[in-house]
From Swiss-Prot:
Summary of the function given for this chain in its UniProt record: Key component of innate and adaptive immunity. TLRs (Toll-like receptors) control host immune response against pathogens through recognition of molecular patterns specific to microorganisms. TLR9 is a nucleotide-sensing TLR which is activated by unmethylated cytidine-phosphate-guanosine (CpG) dinucleotides. Acts via MYD88 and TRAF6, leading to NF-kappa-B activation, cytokine secretion and the inflammatory response. Upon CpG stimulation, induces B-cell proliferation, activation, survival and antibody production.
Residue stretches spanning the membrane: 818-838
S-palmitoyl cysteine-type lipidated residues: C258, C265
Entry coiled-coil feature ranges: none
Organism of provenance: Felis catus (Cat)
Quaternary state and interactors: Monomer and homodimer. Exists as a monomer in the absence of unmethylated cytidine-phosphate-guanosine (CpG) ligand. Proteolytic processing of an insertion loop (Z-loop) is required for homodimerization upon binding to the unmethylated CpG ligand leading to its activation. Interacts with MYD88 via their respective TIR domains. Interacts with BTK. Interacts (via transmembrane domain) with UNC93B1. Interacts with CD300LH; the interaction may promote full activation of TLR9-triggered innate responses.
Single Gene Ontology BP annotation: positive regulation of MAPK cascade
Residues in compartment: Cytoplasmic: 839-1031
Recorded GO CC terms: early phagosome; endolysosome; endoplasmic reticulum; endoplasmic reticulum membrane; endosome; lysosome; plasma membrane
Protein name: Toll-like receptor 9
Amino acid sequence: MGPCHGALHPLSLLVQAAALAVALAQGTLPAFLPCELQRHGLVNCDWLFLKSVPHFSAAAPRGNVTSLSLYSNRIHHLHDSDFVHLSSLRRLNLKWNCPPASLSPMHFPCHMTIEPHTFLAVPTLEELNLSYNSITTVPALPSSLVSLSLSRTNILVLDPANLAGLHSLRFLFLDGNCYYKNPCPQALQVAPGALLGLGNLTHLSLKYNNLTAVPRGLPPSLEYLLLSYNHIITLAPEDLANLTALRVLDVGGNCRRCDHARNPCMECPKGFPHLHPDTFSHLNHLEGLVLKDSSLYNLNPRWFHALGNLMVLDLSENFLYDCITKTTAFQGLAQLRRLNLSFNYHKKVSFAHLHLAPSFGSLLSLQQLDMHGIFFRSLSETTLRSLVHLPMLQSLHLQMNFINQAQLSIFGAFPGLRYVDLSDNRISGAMELAAATGEVDGGERVRLPSGDLALGPPGTPSSEGFMPGCKTLNFTLDLSRNNLVTIQPEMFARLSRLQCLLLSRNSISQAVNGSQFMPLTSLQVLDLSHNKLDLYHGRSFTELPRLEALDLSYNSQPFSMQGVGHNLSFVAQLPALRYLSLAHNDIHSRVSQQLCSASLRALDFSGNALSRMWAEGDLYLHFFRGLRSLVRLDLSQNRLHTLLPRTLDNLPKSLRLLRLRDNYLAFFNWSSLVLLPRLEALDLAGNQLKALSNGSLPNGTQLQRLDLSSNSISFVASSFFALATRLRELNLSANALKTVEPSWFGSLAGTLKVLDVTGNPLHCACGAAFVDFLLEVQAAVPGLPGHVKCGSPGQLQGRSIFAQDLRLCLDEALSWDCFGLSLLTVALGLAVPMLHHLCGWDLWYCFHLCLAWLPRRGRRRGADALPYDAFVVFDKAQSAVADWVYNELRVRLEERRGRRALRLCLEERDWLPGKTLFENLWASVYSSRKMLFVLAHTDRVSGLLRASFLLAQQRLLEDRKDVVVLVILRPDAHRSRYVRLRQRLCRQSVLLWPHQPSGQRSFWAQLGTALTRDNQHFYNQNFCRGPTTAE
């Protein structure tokens, strides 16, 4: 089958379209091309750059489609008939198809057109998302609608007519229609009572709309009202009248604190916001209240007096740094479970210590307290004294407070505390006694540098699938990203029930010897990653008898020190250790020759230098063999170029998962997998494998998952996977495969659950066999309709393999050949008789003229290896001669001969500047077939003419080629003896300019002949045979 060339002929396109329709009708192709049918009746058409809604085949189970996602396409026009065929459609996502110009990445203007009955034709529709589309009015909507999103559009007016008839609507989102990213000429206008007809509306979000007041006439059924980041700076009871069913109210960001803003901010007017004391007095069912970023300096207790059911209160990003030490506002909030006071700092000030107000002690249901970003330097028992007797308190967030002295033992007095976050502070060690009593630095303030004080990024998570988290443990303390240099046992006094300790990203550089964590007898997870630990002592961490997970990754500095040894024998002395990470330490030499443990089940050894360790003979050959219970082993990024069978033979036989990602393996001995009899998952992604041709997966292997993605595999041997009968998941994505053959799998193909072939340059030739095979196993191929793409031919590159049905498409090369042959036959059949009848004699004459011309042209092409036909030499000092050369000779020979034009070399035009005169002259003589001397007279020749003539004579002597052609403009002038002799021997190489105009035509014909033919043919055979080449 030939490759595709050029554009498809319209007839071919028509035939292929018909073939595709037939295939779809037969149900052989994926039913919802170009989209993908996913679970629960969802048809996913995201990111396909569609310009219209796809109309699926009648043979597709359109009645089973309940959700259609058209997110991030280019659909600018919605027709009445677009969704008629989807009779069971309940959810429709049209987000990001025609965004407003200000929200578009390229700021292109766009306008979406929606015809009147587009959505009315879908009476079952319940959820509709039209966010991020440039629409200015609410389209006609079916009464069945339950959820409607019109956020980030250009809708600026809401009146009763817009939403009439939507009696089932419960969720309405109209966020961001008028703010700095989506500017507008006016704020969103909600007419009084515009939403009153929505009797079942429970969720209303109007954030980022430049509203200056709460819309009037809201439906009393509202339970969630979100009005944050508008310009509502006054709230009174009448603003929320009749909203007695409210459960969540968000009015934060309406009067902002701009020194902590991360986006354009308008300063809150002085004396605002103004919240009437009874604003929330009638909201008895309120469970969540957001007053964040509202420039509050004080809390009025009357605000919360009637909120007995309040569970969540967000007061972050205000100015409550003094209020929280003396307020009584929390005394009536017995049901409050979460309180956020983050970033209530004094601008440019850090307090020496902080004492929470006694009213915190009345929050008997409090479970989580966020207090990061308040900026106090000392954490002592008096700081949290008000919280000690809260029986439900589980989570305490104190990160990013610039704390440099912390009495960690105070957390032992909190019986229900499960998580304490002290990360991103400046804690450097155990708190001194004076500081712990709170006697020093009382009330002192330290000025801080100005700047953004946003919360820093979270730490890097542990290795996925290897290190467990701490969410299920009873007590976790996070001290990551502090200034700890050493660990002292006194730091953890009274913390014996601590089960998870996070110390990553400090500067701990001490040699751990088994005494640092002695009080932590219940510790199960210890994270010491991103430090500088010295593992010299053999009893490191042995004081932790219950330790199950230990993360020592990214402690590479000690291992990079030349000549320093490292002792890993402590692993054998941790009886409960199940997870260990030594990743990214660049371990390569002077370490224990063998790791031993009877309990370890997962080891992350990625990012080291096993290639250097295993290059030391048998010194580290048995490095992992002593891990008798090891199930998972990660050897990624170890710079491995080869993996010998004896190396695999010395890995633990209990292994079930082996990762070898991102090494340099160009060869793998597949038969050696029998040496790991329990191996179920093998990850070889990101290596340099180019072919799977050396043998096959061995018979009897337990392998279930094989990842070969991101290699350079272009060939797979027949039956390579066939013997691995337990294989269920195979990843061949991002390779160089041009086809996928069923012969690779044998009977295994029908049992595969995952076969990933995305990112391969598949060759989409007509009749490609891989299409039939992928259709047979399409349930196992992720992204088959839209993400399995062609790599060739060029016109299909980057397109889905179903852009045309490769099983029924026409052979492109054969199509063009047949088309060309038929066209030629018809043309000749019509043209030959007609031309013979009309101009037979003329054609006969032209035919013989061409026969006479072709041999001459052939000879000329054979000899024409030089860039110029003639080098024109004349005396520039004679203006008449120069004028004749430029305006007569050049025009006649170069411009008026058509396709027989000659290439002349002229001194003024073709000589290269920067070269000497002789270099240019030499190049011109030897780059031209002939030398044309234009002379007014022949008796006195000097200068350039003489030098050129001597070079021509030299060429005659050296190359035996006579290249001289003379043109004499004054025939009556005295002729030299050389000219007369040349006229006698080679008359056609001496041409005289005729005085009569009638003879000029003959002159130009003779000159053309003289310049295009060899002078050998012009010599008079009676006198001379001309120059001959010596044999």
